[in-house]
Amino acid sequence: WKITNCVNTGDIKNGVSAIGGILGYMGNLDGPGTVIISDCINKGNIAVSGNDVGGIVGNLNSHGSSSQHHKYINCYNYGNISSNSGSTDGVFVGGIVGKEYGFAEFNGCRNYGTVNASSTSANSISGGICGWIEDDTSSFADCINYGKVTAKNNIGGILGEVSKAYN
């Protein structure tokens, strides 16, 4: 799969799960393969009540397949990204990606907008580039966050939380 040179300029104001400026959700990715999302730009503001929200991608899910490789190359977000959710599953918000399952590489990504995750009933996690990532072998190179990042729980200028960070 490849998604390249896409631009969103429209605001997104509704949505309850997996909301992204370019891609909301891609899942059921079993077996070997690579997903490349490159040179994509979001200029729209996203203000929703969803639980996986990102300026470029809401949720990319390979269901724990170690043979899945996800690449985010030179993706830029200029919009303000926020979710105010009552979801019991948690709220994950990122300038580029809200929630990422699998081995991911982030290269040359930038976030310029504010990123905010708030929840009344569960964890809220925010990252300037990625809110939550499962795989501890993922990498970030030449990524910069210029925006304010806020959340109730885990907050990171680049990454809010790594789920499986152990040896």
Q: What function would you assign to each model-found segment?
A:
Residues 1-167:
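Predominantly extracellular beta-rich ligand-binding scaffolds that present long acidic/polar faces
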